[in-house]
Amino acid sequence: MNSSVQGYRRVVVKLGTSVLTSGSKSLDKAHMVELARQMAGLMKSGVEVVLVTSGAIAAGREHLGYPVLPDTMANKQLLAAVGQSQLILAWSQLFSIYGLHVGQLLLTRADLHDRERYLNARDTLNALLAQGIVPIINENDAVATTEIKVGDNDNLSARAALLCDADLLMLLTDQKGLFDADPRKEPNARLIPEVEHIDDSLRLLAGGSVSGLGTGGMATKLQAADIARRAGVEVIIASGHHPEVIKKAVHREAVGTRFLAIESPLESRKQWILAGPKAKGRLLLDIGAVAAVTCRGRSLLSKGITGVEGQFERGDTLELVSPDGRVVARGMARYQSQALNLIAGKHSDEIEPLLGYDYGDAVVHRNDMVVLEMIGEAK
């Protein structure tokens, strides 16, 4: 694609259940066609669009006549299985009005965890976009269990943005954006128009949606924004009912809260470490190790580990945790958990005598690590 609008050549649009139902129990087809019109307009102007859509369970309930069912995983998966076909049919019909075809990708965390499957999903996305087809992504709720679920479509959309190397991620919701206080409780709450850095004070501002139909609140949107912007993707959180919201966002008009992308984004493999695999365990670090890996770009050595949590194998993804409980980095383990329990707190020259082998001094190498928060001083 050679064309772009305001520098955007590829955009991911995430639509939450509250947007698609307009707060009701049914899909709001009139609003969906308006959103399809805006996305089709982008496609016609040369901007590629990937749609991440919620609403399968709501569509399933509607199609089955709103049955009264126990709130179990099996029944949620039943509704998702019925509703997903209705949801993709609705989108297919709506985009066909504008001469566009759609292609469906149903993903689970397992598709993102495995590097080969991750790359295959990326190839499929790129192939669809190359043919002018709108990829429509949803989590495969009909088969996903707690262990393999991404968990919410906010985080799924961030991972989709990384998969397809998007320039912009729009998280469209039932809120106007991120406020400096809860607008439902504070009438004088003000919209935050632009965010350069995501820190603990900003996370405290993130509240939840009141619709009750979706799984994502403002906190999950902030998580998604943090993932995407680290990969060089700009993010906008805005109301899906704001007039011409998609067009305005792409033309950089004042709408919602815009999160600026980090200027030096992660390379592809580190993007996958950040957003793909589920962390299988945690390494607790002393403050010296935290400063070394976050501020000085060092690999993690066994000496700086004060505790090991979880069971994991060599190559699994881990969270690195500061003494005050903050996750400061993610990285790939060079030793399994059983071995790390033996060498935690030990000097590197003690690894081989203790284990009978060694894979090098680094427990997590800096090339296999993504720093999330800088703590300490660079020296």
Swiss-Prot record:
Name of this chain's protein: Glutamate 5-kinase
The protein's annotated pathway: Amino-acid biosynthesis; L-proline biosynthesis; L-glutamate 5-semialdehyde from L-glutamate: step 1/2
Origin superkingdom: Bacteria
Organism listed in the record: Shewanella amazonensis (strain ATCC BAA-1098 / SB2B)
Residues that hold substrate according to the record: 54, 141, 153
InterPro entries on file: AceGlu_kinase-like_sf, Asp/Glu/Uridylate_kinase, G5K_ProB, Glu/AcGlu_kinase, Glu_5kinase, Glu_5kinase/COase_Synthase, Glutamate_5-kinase_CS, PUA
CDD domains per record: AAK_G5K_ProB, PUA_G5K
Residue intervals of the PUA domain: 280-358
SMART domains: PUA (SM00359)
EC class: transferase
Keyword terms, alphabetized: Amino-acid biosynthesis, ATP-binding, Cytoplasm, Kinase, Nucleotide-binding, Proline biosynthesis, Transferase
